[in-house]
């Protein structure tokens, strides 16, 4: 016999049943991509946002994280407590700058590439300036 809930959520041809989460759904623990001092900051498949007061170092910190995410080894220079999972598969890394002018964004972009030892932008890195 089908319960009211099962009947209500029965697949009606729109194909959403495979997306439904139940208490019995087996969920794998998230894979940490960025950790600081052993605490998970970002996990695979999620968006990471950095916020803070003006001139608090957000852009510099973002550049460090992005350069480590672009690297093949995930090494972050001079920051022993910061771990970024190595990007050995060249998974997409997106950077959206909503604050800086294009010249400043370009300078930061070059700094990111330099920090991780790249001479040119890899195909898996999208760096976008959204300041209007």
Language model feature labels by segment:
Residues 16, 77-80, 86-132:
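Conserved inter-motif catalytic segment of the P-loop NTP-binding fold
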Residues 39-45, 85-88:
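Phosphate-binding P-loop
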């Amino acid at each position: 016999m089908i319960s009211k809930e099962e009947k209500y959520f029965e697949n009606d041809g729109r194909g959403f049943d495979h997306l439904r989460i139940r208490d019995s759904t087996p969920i794998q623990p998230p894979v940490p991509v960025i950790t600081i001092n052993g605490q998970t900051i970002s996990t695979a498949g999620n968006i990471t946002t950095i916020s803070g007061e003006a001139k608090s170092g957000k852009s510099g910190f973002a550049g460090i994280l992005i350069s480590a995410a672009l690297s093949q080894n995930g090494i972050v220079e001079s920051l022993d407590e910061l771990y970024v999972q190595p990007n050995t598969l060249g998974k997409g890394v997106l950077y959206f700058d909503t604050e800086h002018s294009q010249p400043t964004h370009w300078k930061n972009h070059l700094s990111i590439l330099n920090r991780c030892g790249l001479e040119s932008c890899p195909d898996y890195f999208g760096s976008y300036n959204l300041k209007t």
